UniProtKB/Swiss-Prot annotation:
Gene Ontology terms for molecular function: proton-transporting ATP synthase activity, rotational mechanism; proton-transporting ATPase activity, rotational mechanism
Known partners and oligomeric status: F-type ATPases have 2 components, F(1) - the catalytic core - and F(0) - the membrane proton channel. F(1) has five subunits: alpha(3), beta(3), gamma(1), delta(1), epsilon(1). F(0) has three main subunits: a(1), b(2) and c(10-14). The alpha and beta chains form an alternating ring which encloses part of the gamma chain. F(1) is attached to F(0) by a central stalk formed by the gamma and epsilon chains, while a peripheral stalk is formed by the delta and b chains.
Protein name: ATP synthase subunit b
Compartment annotation: Cell inner membrane
Transmembrane region(s): 12-32
Entry membrane topology: Single-pass membrane protein
Keyword Transport carried by entry: yes
Native organism taxonomy: Bacteria, Pseudomonadati, Pseudomonadota, Gammaproteobacteria, Pseudomonadales
A GO-annotated cellular component: plasma membrane
Family listed: Belongs to the ATPase B chain family.
Function: F(1)F(0) ATP synthase produces ATP from ADP in the presence of a proton or sodium gradient. F-type ATPases consist of two structural domains, F(1) containing the extramembraneous catalytic core and F(0) containing the membrane proton channel, linked together by a central stalk and a peripheral stalk. During catalysis, ATP synthesis in the catalytic domain of F(1) is coupled via a rotary mechanism of the central stalk subunits to proton translocation.
Protein keywords: ATP synthesis, Cell inner membrane, Cell membrane, CF(0), Hydrogen ion transport, Ion transport, Membrane, Transmembrane, Transmembrane helix, Transport
Principal subcellular localisation of the protein: membrane
InterPro entries registered for this protein in UniProt: ATP_synth_B-like_membr_sf, ATP_synth_b/b'su_bac/chlpt, ATP_synth_F0_bsu_bac, ATP_synthase_B_chain
Length: 156
């Protein structure tokens, strides 16, 4: 192999080309590669954050769903308790009303019974006087013996 001027000229031209590429072409290419690498890394980070955010959102949605179910169950339980309470109150009111009606009826019966007893005493007094009059064959003054008749009626 002969080293001649063309080989040296080609080597110098290649060296100038390499220096030119290193000075003007290589930095934008490296910058573009770094920028692309950064974009890819940012995209991967964003995807990772999105996956974490999705997982957190799903956990939060699940927690809210569980809370809503628990709250619904609590509301249903409160409604059942309130329903039972209303039924118990209605039963108690009905019992009180029945006792009141019963007491009123007993009072009316007692009053009626006392009225009948008084009427019976009065009739018994008249019958006793009439019977005594018939037995004795004489007239007995009812006004004079009213006290005696009242005592007799009270004893009966």
């Amino acid at each position: 192999m002969n080293i001649n001027a063309t080989l040296i000229g080609q080597s110098v031209a290649f060296l100038i080309f390499v220096l030119f590429c290193m000075k003007f072409i290589w930095p934008p290419v490296i910058a573009a590669l770094h920028e692309r690498q950064k974009k890819i890394a940012d995209g991967l980070d964003a995807a990772s954050r999105a996956a974490r955010d999705l997982e957190l959102a799903q956990d939060k949605a699940g927690q809210q769903l569980r809370e809503a179910k628990a709250q619904a169950a609590e509301i249903i339980e409160q409604a059942k308790k309130r329903g039972s309470q209303i039924v118990d109150e209605a039963r108690e009111q009905a019992r009180v009303e029945a006792e009141r009606v019963k007491a009123q009826a007993q009072a009316e019966i007692e009053q009626e019974l006392n009225g009948v007893k008084d009427a019976l005493r009065a009739q018994l007094g008249s019958l006793a006087v009439n019977g005594a009059e018939k037995i004795l064959g004489a007239t007995i003054d009812q006004n004079a013996h009213a006290e005696l008749v009242n005592k007799l009626a009270a004893e009966i």
